[in-house]
């Protein structure tokens, strides 16, 4: 089993990814930007902050090009997993899969590779990564674009992705800021959350993004406590630019701007796409209207100068003044690029991430890995590429064939798509295995195929996406958490032929599995998420035992939809009544037994935990440091470490994600029983031991005090939980502050 083996080329790429860094500091970038500012005319300044209208340039967003300085029309392009519309590009696994790897190195490398392809195509601002939707609602349409509904895991992934992307010379854009937690009514709903919930959940990963020097942040469509996100003074000026010390620029989501003067004065720096989507272009809030507002004093000149300085500084920060390539594609004519930015290493990286994100949920009596059986039934439409073509549905707005992306603006055009059946046939070529197929979702046909086989693999799906596309009655958000296309009935029909049945689930997030798990002949269940272009290869790597599965769930799978405590609403208001208690925090707080808990994932080997060591030293009380990029300077001060020994006690090589959870003392008011505050992925051969080390900061043991308006370390005894998941705790300890 080759759990630890990667090609020399990929290892070299990973090593180089970790060695990359920022081109300039913010101070250096601001010095250059300030020098340029004095050379610009008022018209040029307004052009830099205003989009040139929808489809007014080759990219989904474009700005006006000044002539007084050597600065281009900026190209802003989706997205969070590849370069939208362009081809050829590498279609990486979705953010939710990257999160399921729990692997900092792979998430950083994914960012480096995506950034390199974006830069090679001339993109200046890559619209990703995603921390909003965070994922409080398990059925929300765009959760899959982000990494996890846990803010700590999401924050670590955001930082790694941003550092990777920007090291390749492209500006990252952290989105969607803030509380954009559902698609239904996303452009009218008011997300009403209290200050503490905002800080400890939804703002948390944006702290990490800003600390990682993210160049830009996208404000969202929704209102927050009654005020539009893109004209929210407390949100943009108070929190983002004030408390977090953000130095980059804030750009609107496409048509999320609602005013000229108010949006300018409350912190918006760039409007996208500059007009609405009508043809010819309709309302334009900035451009001439912004110039007029400055002329009559409604918007101070200093505010425009600040907008321009922030945008120019972000451009300098990542070295885009140093030979950045011209835009090499058009979003509006099929996207054929004049250069090929894909590489073999990027393809191998996509396969590695997809493979390492696979979560083994059930494995009765070692049913996996599969030997090469005499006969194998492969069942379900998810086993093959969409018969109309992998890219047949615009923005992947259908669920036909194998599911490897969700739908919406966060998608890309497949250069190729390896379907599971293709990879299985490739894997078993020459093995003498008879492969019997039923590549529809018809239960009768599936049962007939299974009855003729020694083992059956059933492929099922659950899809979602952005609300401007409706797929099979789902308006972005999922209507429920059931498998699509009568997946429960298909699995039942197959399993009731008494054939050992393996279920492979391609989904955007949690799916209710109780009907499937009630079938005694369902011997294994695998969650493969949205694995991108190398889907089939990654899956067969695990199914046939070339690699041990090492993914862990970045969300909880409950036994029913009611278990989660949050759902999307048809109302114009969401009061976020669940507060801090989402996902595993909710399950823990209310004593609900999940089907598969947050952080869960089986392996083909076993691991033993021992020798917990805790060395923490700090003082209780609030933060007192000055604001730097990322927040108060002492918030990220190291306070010590927790460590544990982990040994591979099985017979094959494997990787274990060792997880640290912290429980707060009673002096911390109304707080979840435990919260993720560290993870370390150890790759171990049989008999090998390693040390999982978790370095803690003050933030990791702080809560937000609404009265003080500061992060506070509570006094008392903190509980330490180290384990293989949020419920599988192997070691416990404590420390006192």
From Swiss-Prot:
Sugar-modified residues? 225, 340, 365, 608
Q: Which reaction does it catalyse?
A: Hydrolysis of terminal, non-reducing beta-D-glucosyl residues with release of beta-D-glucose
Superkingdom of this protein's organism:
Eukaryota
The annotated active site, in chain numbering, is: 253
The residues the entry assigns to the signal sequence are 1-19
One GO CC term, this protein: extracellular region
Q: Decide whether keyword Nucleotide-binding is in the record.
A: no
Q: Which Pfam families match?
A: Fn3-like, Glyco_hydro_3, Glyco_hydro_3_C
Q: Which Gene3D superfamilies does the record cross-reference, listed alphabetically?
A: Glycoside hydrolase family 3 C-terminal domain (3.40.50.1700), Glycoside hydrolase, family 3, N-terminal domain (3.20.20.300), Immunoglobulins (2.60.40.10)
Which compartments is it annotated to reside in?
Answer: Secreted
Single Gene Ontology MF annotation: beta-glucosidase activity
Principal subcellular localisation of the protein: secreted
What is one process in the GO biological process aspect for this record? cellulose catabolic process
Q: What is its EC number?
A: 3.2.1.21
Q: Does the keyword Metal-binding apply?
A: no
Pathway assigned to this chain's UniProt record: Glycan metabolism; cellulose degradation
Which keywords does this Swiss-Prot/TrEMBL entry list? Carbohydrate metabolism, Cellulose degradation, Glycoprotein, Glycosidase, Hydrolase, Polysaccharide degradation, Secreted, Signal
| Functional note | Beta-glucosidases are one of a number of cellulolytic enzymes involved in the degradation of cellulosic biomass. Catalyzes the last step releasing glucose from the inhibitory cellobiose.
Please report which protein family the annotation says this sequence is part of. Answer: Belongs to the glycosyl hydrolase 3 family.
This chain's protein is named Probable beta-glucosidase L
What organism does this protein naturally occur in?
A: Emericella nidulans (strain FGSC A4 / ATCC 38163 / CBS 112.46 / NRRL 194 / M139) (Aspergillus nidulans)
């Amino acid at each position: 089993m080759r759990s630890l083996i990667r090609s020399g080329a990929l290892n070299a790429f990973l090593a180089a990814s970790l060695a990359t860094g920022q081109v300039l500091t913010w101070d250096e970038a601001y010095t250059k930007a300030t020098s340029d500012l004095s050379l610009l005319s008022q018209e040029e300044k307004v052009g830099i902050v205003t989009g040139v209208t929808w489809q007014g340039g080759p990219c989904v967003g474009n700005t006006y090009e000044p002539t007084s300085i050597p600065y281009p029309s900026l190209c802003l392009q989706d997205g969070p997993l590849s370069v939208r519309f362009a081809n050829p590009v590498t279609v990486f696994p979705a953010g939710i899969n990257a999160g399921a790897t729990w692997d900092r190195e792979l998430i950083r490398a994914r960012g480096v590779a995506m950034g390199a392809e974006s830069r090679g195509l001339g993109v200046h601002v890559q619209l990703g990564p995603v921390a909003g939707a965070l994922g409080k609602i398990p059925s929300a349409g765009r959760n899959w674009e982000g990494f996890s509904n846990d803010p700590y895991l999401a924050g670590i992934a955001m930082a790694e992705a941003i550092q990777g992307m920007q090291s390749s010379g492209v500006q990252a854009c952290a989105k969607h800021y803030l509380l954009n937690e559902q698609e239904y009514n996303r452009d009218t709903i008011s997300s009403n959350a209290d200050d503490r919930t905002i800080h400890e959940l939804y703002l948390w990963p944006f702290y990490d993004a800003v600390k990682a020097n993210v160049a830009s942040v996208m404000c969202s469509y929704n209102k927050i406590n009654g005020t539009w996100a893109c004209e929210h003074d407390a949100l943009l000026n108070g929190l983002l630019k004030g408390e977090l010390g953000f130095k980059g620029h804030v750009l609107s989501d496409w048509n999320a701007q609602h005013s000229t003067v108010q949006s300018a004065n409350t912190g918006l720096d760039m409007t996208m796409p500059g007009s609405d989507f009508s043809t010819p272009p309709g309302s334009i809030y900035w451009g001439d209207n912004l110039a007029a507002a400055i002329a009559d004093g409604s918007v101070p000149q200093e505010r425009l100068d600040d907008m321009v300085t922030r945008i120019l500084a972000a451009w300098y920060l990542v070295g885009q003044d140093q030979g950045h390539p011209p835009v090499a594609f058009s979003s509006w004519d099929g996207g054929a690029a004049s250069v090929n930015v894909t590489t073999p290493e990027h393809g191998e990286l996509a396969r590695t991430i997809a493979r390492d994100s696979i979560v083994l949920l059930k494995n009765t009596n070692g049913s996996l890995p599969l030997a090469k059986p005499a006969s194998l039934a492969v069942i379900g439409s998810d086993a093959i590429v969409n018969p109309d073509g992998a890219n047949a549905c615009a923005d992947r707005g259908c669920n036909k064939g194998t599911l490897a992306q969700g739908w919406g603006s966060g998608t890309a055009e497949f250069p190729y798509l390896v379907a599971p059946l293709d990879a299985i046939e490739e894997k078993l070529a020459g093995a003498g295995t008879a492969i019997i197929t039923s590549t529809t979702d018809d239960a009768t046909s599936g049962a007939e195929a299974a009855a003729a086989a020694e083992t059956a693999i059933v492929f099922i799906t659950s899809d979602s996406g952005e609300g401007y596309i409706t797929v099979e009655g789902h308006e972005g958000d999922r209507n429920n958490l059931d498998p699509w296309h009568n997946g429960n009935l298909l699995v039942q029909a197959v399993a009731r032929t008494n054939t050992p049945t393996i279920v492979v689930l391609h989904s955007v997030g949690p799916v209710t599995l109780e009907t499937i798990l009630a079938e005694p002949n369902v011997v294994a269940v695998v969650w493969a998420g949205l694995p991108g272009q190398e889907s089939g290869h990654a899956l067969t790597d695990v199914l046939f035992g070339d690699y041990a599965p090492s993914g862990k769930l970045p969300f909880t799978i409950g036994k029913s939809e009611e278990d989660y405590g949050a759902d999307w609403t048809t109302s114009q208001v969401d009061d976020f009544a669940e507060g801090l208690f989402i996902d595993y925090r909710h399950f823990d707080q209310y004593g609900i037994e999940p089907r598969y808990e947050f952080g869960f994932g089986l392996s083909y080997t076993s691991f033993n935990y021992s020798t917990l060591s805790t060395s923490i030293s700090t003082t209780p009380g609030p933060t007192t440091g000055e604001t730097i990029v990322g927040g108060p300077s002492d918030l990220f001060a190291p306070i010590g470490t927790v460590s544990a020994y982990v040994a591979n006690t099985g017979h094959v090589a494997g990787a274990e994600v060792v997880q640290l959870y912290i429980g707060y003392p009673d002096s911390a008011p109304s707080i979840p029983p435990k919260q993720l505050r560290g993870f370390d992925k150890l790759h171990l051969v049989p008999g090998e031991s390693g040390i999982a080390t978790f370095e803690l900061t003050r933030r990791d043991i702080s809560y937000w005090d609404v009265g003080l308006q500061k992060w506070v370390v509570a006094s008392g005894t903190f509980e330490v939980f180290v384990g293989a998941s949020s419920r599988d705790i192997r070691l416990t300890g404590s420390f006192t502050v």
